Amino acid sequence: MKKASRSVGSVPKVSAISKTQTAEKIKPENSSSASTGGKLVKPGTAASLSKTKSSDDLLAGMAGGVTVTNGVKGKKSTCPSAAPSASAPAMTTVENKSKISTGTASSTKRSTSTGNKESSSTRERLRERTRLNQSKKLPSAGQGANDMALAKRSRSRTATECDVRMSKSKSDNQISDRAALEAKVKDLLTLAKTKDVEILHLRNELRDMRAQLGINEDHSEGDEKSEKETIMAHQPTDVESTLLQLQEQNTAIREELNQLKNENRMLKDRLNALGFSLEQRLDNSEKLFGYQSLSPEITPGNQSDGGGTLTSSVEGSAPGSVEDLLSQDENTLMDHQHSNSMDNLDSECSEVYQPLTSSDDALDAPSSSESEGIPSIERSRKGSSGNASEVSVACLTERIHQMEENQHSTSEELQATLQELADLQQITQELNSENERLGEEKVILMESLCQQSDKLEHFSRQIEYFRSLLDEHHISYVIDEDVKSGRYMELEQRYMDLAENARFEREQLLGVQQHLSNTLKMAEQDNKEAQEMIGALKERSHHMERIIESEQKGKAALAATLEEYKATVASDQIEMNRLKAQLENEKQKVAELYSIHNSGDKSDIQDLLESVRLDKEKAETLASSLQEDLAHTRNDANRLQDAIAKVEDEYRAFQEEAKKQIEDLNMTLEKLRSDLDEKETERSDMKETIFELEDEVEQHRAVKLHDNLIISDLENTVKKLQDQKHDMEREIKTLHRRLREESAEWRQFQADLQTAVVIANDIKSEAQEEIGDLKRRLHEAQEKNEKLTKELEEIKSRKQEEERGRVYNYMNAVERDLAALRQGMGLSRRSSTSSEPTPTVKTLIKSFDSASQVPNPAAAAIPRTPLSPSPMKTPPAAAVSPMQRHSISGPISTSKPLTALSDKRPNYGEIPVQEHLLRTSSASRPASLPRVPAMESAKTLSVSRRSSEEVKRDISAQEGASPASLMAMGTTSPQLSLSSSPTASVTPTTRSRIREERKDPLSALAREYGGSKRNALLKWCQKKTEGYQNIDITNFSSSWNDGLAFCALLHTYLPAHIPYQELNSQDKRRNFMLAFQAAESVGIKSTLDINEMVRTERPDWQNVMLYVTAIYKYFET
């Protein structure tokens, strides 16, 4: 029997040794558990050596306990292998090392299960043989009683076997449920490292316990107490594994709640960003959505260690914008789950980085199946987590800096866009009021035209009546009547044309006004819808917060339940320790019984056996109660697992709903963008239409006959200047020729002197005196030449300034007259004392009334041509040197203001026409006109030509005026009254653009570059500073904080003032001082404080933009 037991026990020993070796290879940390297992084996071996026989009761109880132990362990050994096999199809990318480790684990599991089955079958056969031998050895006297006891024991054994089978089925169900729950928890959580370590720990414990049980059973056959001790030792292990699972579930619930909190925070951030973009980006369609996001790729580092994943994804991501907030939910959540599985340093980095991913591109993270399938890789990441965390912190710092720059640029551009939108709204309101006023004037004009047409019809009937009377009385009427009737016909035709044009323009303006009102209503409706959408999103956010609060309450309840279970397990552990002590006592008693039995006192043995049976029954009842408590504990664990599954389902549904809402919001945002683009194009079209209509209205009111005089005057001036230039050139040529002749004479004279130097010393002295005289005359001639050149330049500059002043004053007078015309404030066309006739609606009506009633005056009014001098802008500073710029800006700064010059303007009505023409023709014209667009200058010249024709016509009319030709003068007087206003000398497009550029110099720049004024000025600065080193202008705050941008911009115009190659970005104060001094040297006043610019990293972008606008206005307009 000993040989058989040894041979049978050798198989579990080998398997146990191989299992412990593989366990040590997989996880060296579990050596402590193996050592404790060895300690447990020694007392069992000693007990087996001291005991050779046992009673049938102890053998029956031991057999039942062994069956339970083997069944439970067999099922538990299959459970850990089933969970990875269920999760294995979900893995997509696993390295070869992980595959090898999982393969070895599965092979060891299979060998363990087969070894356990074989050992259990051999133990059953050995127990049967021992029972038969012991029944034969019993004495024949007590055989009857023993047979009765055997029958009872067999019945009790069958009952215990039924109980064991039931407990087996229950334990099998519980183990299968636990395996399913473990698979679910693994699928939900990405904490692969923790789960893997715990699974390996449990496997090593199972192997150690199986090795201990095999050794104890093989070396002590029939040792019921040692096997019962093994059962009692196994039950706390099962409870401890259950508690470990509960703790894991609790941590998983905490992590899920943290994820929900982070997701709620992300949703709030996205709502704020979305509301901000909807409210403040109505006029900027090409803006903050232009930042492109590079697609991050999974680098090899994310398979070798977890820290590399964070580093590679930070390096692979690009700067984002507010659009990326609405499209990267899933990746952000996966990244958050993956970062929670790192150690403390990496988890801190991930907590720092997580809110960054909610406002920019979401980082690419490995999937849950990949992170589950790599336990060995997760273990290897500890070594590289420190380096990866340092790299991650550096990358995060750089990323935070980039995102701050993008955020400040975006806010700056949004504020500039809002300001421009407010300006455009104000301009639109002004244009609407202007259109309304023009419409009212047109209504008045139409009424007056209707009245005049009625009067015309009445007068025509009277004329017919008077003609019929004259024909009846045979009285011949004069030819002047025919002339007068022709004049009335011409007036009638003019009235009809004006009425038709006014009606057509009124219809056009009404259509434009209706279109603008409809567009405004649509914009208000879209704004209202956007506000409603924002309110709905806020309500949804509140609902999500309430859900999270309820989840937190559930989590607190689960934590309390877990504490209760811990307390229960602690009490059970205390009870088990007490039972172990009792078991030791019982072992001692059994040893005493064996000794007494050997001595031969059987009566005492019977009493002791009865007491032992009673103690055994008590111990069995206590064990059954403990098993019931264990069953209750497992049921509670199942309920907790169900609650966790429900929470997970709710979380998945909530996540899907959030994704759908985000997609809907993205679609709504795209629609709003497209609508905004369409409205922007419609708005620009409307502006162009308004400008064109305004031009047409002004052109219909202006008379186009003022161009020839200005052109002829300019041609005469150019001819005179050319003649003067030729005269000066002839004088210079004569002086040069005289100089050459004198120098030739001097050389000849010197040659003669050299030949006769010995003979004529006295002639030499005379010649030297003549040489001195000639040099003095030459110097005087040169000085005279220089004086003449300077006088010529002064005359030219004076004439240019005078001519520019006349043109500038003329433009101002034109605008004043236009304002007077619009306000309806003017004097009558027929007034002989008026020197500045401005035809308005009322004056036209009065002129039409007086044309048919009052005789014409003796002299017609001479139209005014304001040509008084005014200050003119200097040429661009880039075209002259700094010294010349100072000399030019001197007299201009001391010039009189425009109003004073316009008040001192002479009254050309009091000057004779011949003197006026002589003064105009003799006045010099500049060689180059001021810097205005070519089209505007051409229009000004054409208008001036028409004004000259009007003046000539007025002169001829004044000279040829007589009482006999008053009717002819009356015929042309409406044309004169309409054409005599200086308003006609400038086209409305030119006037509106000049007015707009004087008010806002960035409007032309915005038309040139497109987009908003801020972006246009930014592009202009980038174009000007292109090619300069260390210059990157992306905004008007941080890009200008070192002063190099100012220096580069001013260096393009003033290279003599700024030594750009010597500048350094560290010396900010010197850069700002150089730039501001250079700007002040040409008259640009500094509006920025040097100390504030040096101190702050982000100066006020509005102040910087105003200063750059002043630079652009000075040098480019």
UniProtKB/Swiss-Prot annotation:
Q: What is its main location?
A: cytoplasm
**One GO BP:** negative regulation of microtubule depolymerization
- Which SMART domains does the UniProt record give? CH (SM00033)
Q: Which UniProt keywords apply?
A: Cell cycle, Cell division, Cell junction, Coiled coil, Cytoplasm, Cytoskeleton, Disease variant, Gap junction, Phosphoprotein
* Source domain of life: Eukaryota
Q: Which CDD domains match?
A: CH_CYTS
Domain Calponin-homology (CH): from-to ranges: 1011-1116
Low complexity: which segments have biased composition?
A: 45-90, 358-377, 971-990
Q: What does this protein do?
A: Involved in cytokinesis and spindle organization. May play a role in actin cytoskeleton organization and microtubule stabilization and hence required for proper cell adhesion and migration.
Q: Which family does it belong to?
A: Belongs to the cytospin-A family.
Q: How does it assemble?
A: May interact with both microtubules and actin cytoskeleton.
> PANTHER family from the entry?
CALPONIN HOMOLOGY DOMAIN-CONTAINING PROTEIN DDB_G0272472-RELATED (PTHR23167), CYTOSPIN-A (PTHR23167:SF18)
Name by which UniProt lists this protein = Cytospin-A
By which gene is this protein encoded? SPECC1L
